[in-house]
Amino acid sequence: MVGTTTTDVPPTMGVKIFSAGVAACLADVITFPLDTAKVRQQIQGEFPITSGIRYKGVLGTITTLAKTEGPLKLYSGLPAGLQRQISFASLRIGLYDTVQEFFTSGEETPSLGSKISAGLTTGGVAVFIGQPTEVVKVRLQAQSHLHGLKPRYTGTYNAYRIIATTESLTSLWKGTTPNLLRNVIINCTELVTYDLMKGALVRNEILADDVPCHFVSALIAGFCTTLLSSPVDVVKTRFINSPPGQYASVPNCAMTMFTKEGPTAFFKGFVPSFLRLGSWNVIMFVCFEKLKGELMRSRQTVDCAT
């Protein structure tokens, strides 16, 4: 299981939730420029007014952003991103083992079905709770002051207020459907692949349950997740970032992309998306496993002392 550590005592649900939140925030801080590059590539070609600047490749996108809008633009939306990890990743990852045990129904070895069911459940709940932070994060990453475009928002909390007052409170949940589909795919693929890879490596004595095992499992999980979730991710980003009335619905957004830009539009930003998700997975899972272990060892030490 994702929650298994090398300590004798299994981590509590609270330890898992806390560890997942902290590890996810650390991973977000380190990989956020890649996420911003992914968003910019995904919306490229949507508005003719921004056609003066073209983003080419991961490094090209990052350097172009830094030169034209300043290095800090790479971290625009980070506060909302951290809020997202606290409300989203802590639940979808931290609750995974607990929910999986519920679906296992006393079975000694969790089935693939119980793993997928756990991923679907925790991913769905986390998306609904964390969607407002996702909307604000994407819009702050996407907005640009170039070519006469006036930024819609001056900061994180200003974005929450303007979206709620000028559009509607429900607009903070805009794009919930594609984001739900995206994160159900991500959660199931990411956690189940990591779980299966880690179990196979340890069970077959290829690697011990330590950093190298966590690294390999997380990287493979990141690639599989990016491949399956990319089309939905691009549609989600376009729909969330769109002004009111641009797209009639999520299917209309997808169809507009297909007819105007072709099928390759659904894989825009794939490389930065994989680099971001792959590195995010490695950092998050390695820190998650280590933090859980240290917290449980500290707890055992305190219990022994008392």
Curated annotation (Swiss-Prot):
Protein name according to UniProt: Mitochondrial brown fat uncoupling protein 1
Cellular component terms (Gene Ontology): mitochondrial inner membrane
Residue intervals annotated with topology Mitochondrial intermembrane: 1-10, 97-115, 195-211, 289-306
Organism, scientific name: Oryctolagus cuniculus
Family: Belongs to the mitochondrial carrier (TC 2.A.29) family.
Solcar repeats: 11-102, 110-200, 209-294
UniProt xrefs under SUPFAM superfamilies: Mitochondrial carrier (SSF103506)
Localisation per UniProt entry: Mitochondrion inner membrane
Residues annotated as binding fatty acid 16:0: 56, 268
Record topological domains on the Mitochondrial matrix side: 33-73, 133-177, 232-265
High-level lineage: Eukaryota, Metazoa, Chordata, Craniata, Vertebrata
Cited function: Mitochondrial protein responsible for thermogenic respiration, a specialized capacity of brown adipose tissue and beige fat that participates in non-shivering adaptive thermogenesis to temperature and diet variations and more generally to the regulation of energy balance. Functions as a long-chain fatty acid/LCFA and proton symporter, simultaneously transporting one LCFA and one proton through the inner mitochondrial membrane. However, LCFAs remaining associated with the transporter via their hydrophobic tails, it results in an apparent transport of protons activated by LCFAs.
Free-text description of this protein's post-translational modifications in UniProt: May undergo sulfenylation upon cold exposure. May increase the sensitivity of UCP1 thermogenic function to the activation by noradrenaline probably through structural effects. May undergo ubiquitin-mediated proteasomal degradation.
Record's bilayer topology term: Multi-pass membrane protein
Keywords assigned: Ion channel, Ion transport, Membrane, Mitochondrion, Mitochondrion inner membrane, Oxidation, Repeat, Transmembrane, Transmembrane helix, Transport
